[in-house]
């Protein structure tokens, strides 16, 4: 749900243009008449992911209880509009995560993730990928599959975790993370239990804040 939403609509030559103002976000949205040809263009000044997520994380089933895709509605990526998204400031509550660029392009079997970039005061991430209908040996389209390759860096892992509301005993430690993986279904079907690929994580030299003795022995 969006709080205090104000919406204004105007008609352009070949698109509707929406002016959005809410507690969680603000900006403009251009909805073309042919979104597979012209992408939906979103130019947002800010998006608060914490406010948008609400209680979704607390109600999501644990990994062991992730339902089979056969029991879920499957979206055909060949029917999903292309998107050109620019967010000046992505927030998690009061934390500034940086500027987000996300661009998808239509292809015959689905969508390409042509650009994914988040650059902020504590680091950034870049990625690419696709969401397509897989083809069998006869050339017929089968189930959808999502592929994603992402690289991320931060100059201070502990501070980043704390800004995201995670407890962290690490300070002044740089970190790098990489992922190259695919999973059945769409981007929203991501789950560790479905993942096929590689995930890497490296933490550089840093310091530990005061921790409990048991935690210190473990480290």
Describe the function of each predicted region.
Residues 64-78:
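N-terminal leader/targeting segments and the immediate start of mature chains
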Residues 1, 6-8, 21-26, 33-62, ...:
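Small-residue helix/turn framework positions
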Residues 9-18:
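N-terminal mature ectodomain segment of secretory-pathway/periplasmic proteins
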């Amino acid at each position: 749900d969006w709080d205090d939403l104000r919406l204004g609509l105007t008609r352009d030559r070949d698109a509707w243009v929406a002016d959005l103002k809410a507690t969680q976000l603000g900006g403009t949205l251009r909805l073309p008449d042919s979104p597979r040809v012209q992408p939906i263009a979103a130019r947002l000044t800010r998006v608060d992911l914490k406010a948008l997520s609400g209680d979704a994380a607390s109600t999501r089933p644990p990994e062991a209880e992730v339902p089979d895709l056969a029991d879920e509605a499957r979206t055909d990526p060949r029917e999903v509009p292309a998107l050109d998204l620019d967010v000046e400031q992505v927030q998690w509550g009061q934390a500034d995560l940086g500027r987000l660029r996300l661009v998808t392009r239509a292809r015959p079997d689905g969508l390409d993730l042509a650009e994914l970039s988040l650059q902020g005061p504590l680091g950034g991430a870049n990625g690419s990928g696709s969401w397509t209908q897989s083809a069998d040996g006869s050339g017929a389209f089968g189930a959808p599959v999502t592929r994603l390759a992402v690289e991320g860096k931060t100059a201070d892992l502990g501070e980043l975790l704390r800004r995201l509301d995670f407890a962290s005993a690490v300070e002044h430690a740089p970190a790098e993370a990489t992922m190259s993986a695919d999973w059945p279904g769409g981007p929203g079907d991501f789950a560790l239990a479905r993942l096929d690929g590689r995930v890497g994580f490296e933490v550089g030299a840093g310091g530990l804040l005061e921790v409990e003795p048991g935690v210190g022995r473990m480290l």
